[in-house]
Amino acid sequence: MNSSIGKFFVAACLLLGGLLYFTWMHFLDDFYRQQIPAEVEVGAMLYADSGIRGGCGSAIFALGPRSKAQLVLSGKRALAGARLESVDERGPGISKDWKETPYIYRDKEFRAESYWSTLSCSWISRTRYDTIMGALDKPGSFFRQYKEGVTLVIPSADLVVYLFF
């Protein structure tokens, strides 16, 4: 009898843990999607992680096929109206416009201290890290900086990356 109660308890704990995990992942998916302008069509969330205290992190989505086609056809013009009302756009070096890569590091800005360094807060795979950092060095990707985050759209890799700090 005690054995069946123990098995039931373990099964109930596993079920509850699974439900909590999927609820948390759904919350993160929804929260991070709100940080991407609606004009940038995103598919499935491929990755999300933040530092131990949540001070920095990243979310990576698949780029939707319509957005990719528009970006390939029109370039940065496809993002002309892409705005977020919920983010703070004030501060030094922050522009309300989307920019095309390559990313030009500002005077005295070290790569390790740039917007892109928040990738190191996440347990991102080396290949995905190289894809994102490589996209910053060549033309064809688009980014928009906010006071506490940045969105990077990489059509060549079918990725949309949101970094926050």
Predicted regions and their residues:
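N-terminal export/targeting and maturation segments
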Residues: C13-E89
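Functional cores of ribonucleases/endoribonucleases
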Residues: A80-A157
